[in-house]
A protein has these predicted regions:
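Terminal helices and disordered tails flanking the catalytic cores of nucleotide-processing hydrolases
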Residues: 1-120, 297-416
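Generic secondary-structure boundary/loop-capping signal
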Residues: 8, 14, 31-33, 152-155, ...
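Short, flexible, glycine/charge-rich loop motifs used to bind or transfer phosphoryl groups or to couple energy/partner
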Residues: 43, 128, 268-269
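Helix-turn-helix-type domain boundary/helix-start signal
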Residues: 34-35, 183, 216, 241, ...
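Alpha-helical scaffolding flanking metal-ion-dependent phosphate/phosphodiester catalytic sites
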Residues: 172, 195-206, 221-235, 239-321, ...
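Short secondary-structure boundary/hinge segments and terminal tails
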Residues: 63-64, 198, 215, 255
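Acidic/His-rich, divalent-metal-binding segments that scaffold phosphate/diphosphate chemistry
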Residues: 79-227, 234-246
Length: 416
């Protein structure tokens, strides 16, 4: 790496940016490590008060030889060992076997969300521009191929347990955007849903960390204290005057329920923000399929069943429950199924119009032997071998000792 610090006036398209003299959360850019592609980007940087930048001449253009930079910090080219954090970022942005879009979008967004929560813990609320940049990046990919990004969420669920607030925030954001699109919301409202989902648990940073970790097991005074996170989040985010009112309402009302059993204000259906209800139902689903502390995760199909029952009890509007199930499927991505043929299959996609007939990857034959090459089949379409396959029941991957993730990873190149 060969870096140089130069004045913003010396920056031109074709240079590779690695740092600026303004904190990332005070700019509208998701990342400062990027190729500068046009003059408009440079003008925006100037508008946000950036005066000095650092470029990497090994990845982009250098200054003309006749130009003397204000300060130079040349480092010898060749192999260097980057700091741990920087190395992690570079690995995450390298092509990964053709599945770069979903993997990289998710990894970049996760890194940005982690920075937001780190700043929140220091009492620094994110700018609306920084939050919107993350959401817009994810939304573009959801609009382009929701299967790939939903699969990435499923893979993360399988590979990890007891995930951090950032993991839950990002997954809730992705799934909320999918539901918002399925609900027919216009893009400005989709973005507000995504921003609210990303920040819905911001108030937890103001509560004891050990209490937050066991939040699903608390009762009494601890539970009452945890329920304050909605108001604490609004207070924290309101310190930035530009945060949209609808985003703040999502943060405040995502635990409200249509039957009045929610918190913090026990609002009824007609008083709850519809955008907050979207984030609320996704929040419940994501919590159910995530292992936290001693509480095991539900398999996705069982979580969908619980959502249906919640709709029957009046906790969520039935049309919203229907939209949620249509979005993620009766058998969500990552579900392990037993087919009527005796074969096992992993769900790799959903059919919104035929929710009982997902896209699957058939992994074992009727005798339980593994197929050398799994069969990718749309259960809603006629089979080439004229075999009629239907879902017999849902299996628990843990009990079956099946690593579902290894069957999901290879679909990313195809889906992306």
């Amino acid at each position: 790496m060969a870096t140089k610090q130069i004045a913003i006036e010396q920056l031109v398209p074709g240079m590779y940016l690695v740092d600026v003299d303004v904190p990332w959360y005070r700019t509208p850019f998701l990342f400062h490590k990027r190729m500068v592609n046009d003059l408009q980007t440079i003008e925006i940087m100037k508008q946000y008060g950036i005066r000095m930048v650092t470029i990497d001449t090994s990845k982009g253009a250098d200054l003309p030889l006749t130009t003397t930079p204000s300060s130079v910090n040349d480092q010898p080219a060749g192999p260097t060992v980057p700091p741990p954090q920087e190395a992690q970022v570079e690995r995450a942005t390298e092509p990964v076997l053709g599945c770069q879009p979903a993997v990289v979008i998710y990894a970049q967004a996760k890194e940005a969300v982690e920075r937001i929560f780190d700043d929140l813990e220091r009492g620094v609320p994110p700018t609306p521009e920084a939050t919107k940049a993350i959401v817009s990046n994810v939304l573009d990919h959801v609009l382009n191929d929701r299967v790939a990004i939903a699969t990435q969420v499923a893979i993360q669920k399988i590979k990890q347990f007891d995930r951090s607030l950032t993991g839950h925030a990002l997954d809730t954001c992705v799934l909320s955007l999918i539901v918002a699109i399925e609900s027919g919301l216009e893009q400005p409202q989709q973005e507000l849903v995504g921003m609210g989902a990303l920040l819905h648990d911001a108030g937890y940073v103001r509560l004891p960390r050990n209490l937050v970790r066991k939040r699903d097991e608390c009762s009494g005074q601890d539970k009452t204290l945890l329920e304050q996170h909605c108001k604490l989040g609004v207070t924290l985010l309101s310190e930035h005057p530009g945060m949209h009112e609808d985003v703040l309402r999502i943060v405040l009302e995502h635990h409200e329920r249509t039957d009045g059993t929610g918190f913090p204000a026990a609002l009824g259906n007609d008083k709850i923000s519809p955008l907050a209800q979207i984030v609320g139902i996704v929040d419940v689903y994501d919590a159910m399929v995530t292992r936290r502390g001693t509480r095991p995760a539900l398999i996705p199909h069982d979580a969908v069943r619980q959502l249906f029952l919640a709709g029957e009890r009046g906790q969520f509007p039935k049309p919203l429950v229907e939209t949620m199930i249509r979005s993620i499927g009766v058998y969500p991505v990552g579900s392990l199924l037993k087919l009527n043929t005796g074969e096992q299959a992993v769900v790799v996609g959903v059919n919104p119009q035929q929710r009982l007939k997902p896209l699957v990857k058939v992994t074992t034959d009727p005798q339980g032997g593994s197929y050398a090459t799994p069969l990718e089949i749309d259960l809603a379409a006629p089979s080439s071998d004229h075999t009629v396959r239907t879902v017999l029941r849902v299996l628990d991957p843990i009990h079956e000792r099946v690593n579902v993730a290894i069957h999901l990873d290879p679909i990313l190149p195809r889906a992306a």
